Design a protein with these regions (language model features):
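Conserved ABC ATPase signature
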Residues: 134-138, 142
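Conserved catalytic motifs of ABC-family nucleotide-binding domains
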Residues: 90-99, 108
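Helix-to-loop junction immediately C-terminal to a conserved catalytic motif
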Residues: 54
Length: 222
């Protein structure tokens, strides 16, 4: 990997709240077109680390650079468009699936065609009729897919995935992972994900195992 391909450099980042360490110091690097997976037991700080990288939480110590610039010096809105975080339980907005998929376009003062959004739904095996479906009628798996598609309307450079396939059956997990793999391969998307799925771990370039805060983290062979 070259310096030019380095997107994220996480340097000894840790997090504590009310005197309790929730994330022991972690260091990692993420390059263009790389897929890195975080594993480890509950309470090891995996989601906390992703939220810090996404600039949703402020680290207690350490430093993160994006394209060799300290993320604390960057415009948060612009940074989050480039480094996009997908929640395990998506926060959906408005009333319909259309409202959610159109939101990234509206932020950029643009309007998508229905054909564009229908094609997006088709990429994760969701029917065109889903576009007008009320979000309260969606299953957990449908919500996860809609949340992911919302983040992919404008391709970020880095996608942060917080167990986004946890509510999916094996068939739909395969669909989502195939989509992500193709984006990594064809669009040079870089991904940091949290997963305990053996197949997802095997597809990663690197695996970082987090332990309890007193123990830190270790890289494992993918």
């Amino acid at each position: 990997m070259t310096t030019e391909s380095l997107l994220l450099d996480v340097q000894a980042v840790s997090y504590a709240m009310q005197g309790r360490t929730l994330l022991a110091p972690v260091s990692l690097q993420l390059h263009v077109g790389e897929r890195l997976l975080l594993t480890g037991p509950s309470g090891s700080g995996k989601s906390t680390l992703l939220k810090i990288i996404a600039s949703l939480l402020e680290a207690s110590a350490g430093k993160i650079t994006f394209e060799q610039r300290d993320i604390t010096t960057l415009n948060p809105e612009h940074y989050r468009q480039q480094v996009s975080y997908c929640f395990q339980t998506p926060q959906l907005f408005g009333e319909t699936v259309y409202d959610n998929l159109a939101l990234p376009w509206q932020i950029r003062q643009q309007k998508p065609t229905r054909e564009q959004l229908v094609a997006s739904l088709a990429s994760v095996q969701l029917a065109a009729e889903m576009l007008d479906k009320n979000i309260e009628q969606l299953s957990g798996g449908e919500k996860q897919r809609v949340g992911l598609l919302r983040n992919l309307q404008f391709m970020p450079k880095v996608l942060l995935l917080d167990e986004v396939t946890s509510a999916l059956d094996e068939e739909n997990k395969l669909i989502i992972n195939s989509l992500i793999d193709s984006l990594v391969r064809e669009k040079n998307l870089a991904v940091i994900g949290i997963s305990h799925d053996v197949n997802e771990i095997r597809s990663a370039n690197n695996v970082l195992k987090l332990h309890a805060p007193a123990q830190g983290a270790e890289h494992e062979p993918a």
